[in-house]
């Protein structure tokens, strides 16, 4: 079936994302071939399983996982039988949707993925013959007539090595094919989704009568990948999923189908246990401000939501598993996790859409650590410990589209938005203390500016307002904040900071100067750093401005670097080792514990605390997964 252009849903979504009218994009539907090449048919037979989309009697799409018997791919699984047709002989299990939806002459779509190499190919068409074995109801055979095929983008496939696993005992753990309005997904399934890095996305296009001849009805099956947890679940209703779209090949057939029929299926696989979660529901695409209300930090691509109306969860089903002793290699193109607005525990505050801040000062502490000060013309509300979200589009411009970028894969989803913890703030001003990231686009630009001024116009460092560098202020985020004090009480805190992870604590210390609760703050801090001569002056400066009657502050400094002479007023104990179990065992762990630093540092501290009986749920953490 040669395509005649974009159908009504594809035209709608392309209009929403401003692809319409671009001559370089308008003809991309011609990339979709109407006939399956025999070589591609062989590729499908070499895949370990075939995700397909079918429809139930209500017209809802369901994703199915068709696998070879015993998990061994080859010609006995999928074979080419000529004239753009595939014969599939598959092992299935109780709960597999095709056992309910399978029939002759049904529409079908599939995607073959070779996970060790990230190759993939999409197919769609119809089923001319469907049979379920009489002697074994868990074997199905179908002949697919393929009239749409495209070798699609491999960018977000997480590489993994798979092996046959024939010793399976599939069991339907829970199933609800039709959810009532007040029902939600069980917590077990929500956690399963949040632990996944891959989803198989099924879609359906039901042609309006006036377009049926030109754009016939069809199904779609696609794959979406990202970091673990890239698909989020609303805890408000427990059944709405949010799938962010990333920079891709810009064909948008899956989103176009959703735009037309507002239905989709999500199918998740646990490659280590063989568990499979099948979801179907009502879907919609959100763009621009509508998307940002749900997921504030998502880039300019669409956000797709799925309101689940039915599900099946099967354990130990897939006769293929991730090869023992191998790790998943995440796609280098995957952007950082983006969370729902509701997940920020009510601590995300957005600003006006066009609010800007002015760069007013630069403090260079070393060649790679500096503080940048910004001023706002409108009042700011920032809780000590929160992070500022800035857009650097005005300074750097939008990143140009490229389909692939092997030398810098992260650049493809770079929306020029960055987040840093605020290190100082007042009603109209805030500061960001940061470390320059090697090859970092944004920190590179900021530090290049600072170093250039230091060389040629050092007097400008103390007042950069004349440069008129205005940045977009998106908002402030985070719940890593000081606890609310009870008037007249004593607040005991234990802070663990790794490197530049000291910045939220810097903000908290500076805020204590203004605390009028009458509380006594008793703070022990363990700081691990390679730059004590940079970080210590900033800490001692923050501590020195607080009246001694308010705060007791003790610092355990862990560093292998030489430490300068300290002020007599500073209570610092210097250790030439790393934060270890011995230190944790000898500190008062009844204090409220905060932890901020790079992942290895965070993991070391959490492991030490766990050995002392303090679980991760008792620790307030902040990482750098912005």
Task: Identify the residue ranges that each predicted region occupies.
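Ferredoxin-reductase
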Residues: 350-467, 527-531, 540-543, 558-562
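Extended C-terminal subregions enriched in glycine
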Residues: 243-248, 252-260, 265-280, 295-297, ...
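FNR/FR-type flavoprotein reductase catalytic core
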Residues: 244, 253, 276, 431, ...
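Classical protein tyrosine phosphatase
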Residues: 55, 60-62, 70-74, 98-100, ...
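A short mixed-secondary-structure module that forms the rim of ligand-binding clefts
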Residues: 47-50, 60-118, 224-271
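C-terminal edge-of-domain segments
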Residues: 1-48, 122-240, 257-261, 275-384, ...
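Short, structured patches in soluble enzyme cores that scaffold and shape functional sites
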Residues: 90-92, 112-115, 125-129, 145-148, ...
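Short conserved beta-strand and strand-loop elements enriched in small hydrophobics
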Residues: 52-54, 107-115, 201, 264-269, ...
